[in-house]
Amino acid sequence: MAKAANIKIKLLSTADTGFFYVTSKNSRTKTDKLSFRKYDPVAKKHVEFKETKIK
């Protein structure tokens, strides 16, 4: 059985609120870490979210 191309990742807020989004990415085409500017409802503003591993 072949290894799956898509893996689940966690986007953790850089505002240190502990809030995170879970999404997936294609690990073969996107080898670098993802970084998005999304809404953090705990901080009540848009902040940068960086990719971390799901533990």
Curated annotation (Swiss-Prot):
Instruction: Give the UniProt keywords, A-Z.
Output: Ribonucleoprotein, Ribosomal protein
Q: Which GO terms describe its molecular function?
A: structural constituent of ribosome
Sorted alphabetically, which InterPro entries does this protein's record hold?
A: Ribosomal_bL33, Ribosomal_bL33_CS, Ribosomal_bL33_sf, Ribosomal_zn-bd
* Keyword set includes Ribonucleoprotein: yes
Could you tell me the Gene Ontology terms of the biological process aspect for this record?
translation
Q: Name one Pfam family in it.
A: Ribosomal_L33
The record's GO CC annotations read: cytosolic large ribosomal subunit
Would you identify the family this protein belongs to, as annotated?
A: Belongs to the bacterial ribosomal protein bL33 family.
NCBIfam families for the chain: PRK00595.1 (NF001860), rpmG_bact (TIGR01023)
Q: What is this protein called?
A: Large ribosomal subunit protein bL33
The organism is Mesorhizobium japonicum (strain LMG 29417 / CECT 9101 / MAFF 303099) (Mesorhizobium loti (strain MAFF 303099))
Taxonomic placement? Bacteria, Pseudomonadati, Pseudomonadota, Alphaproteobacteria, Hyphomicrobiales
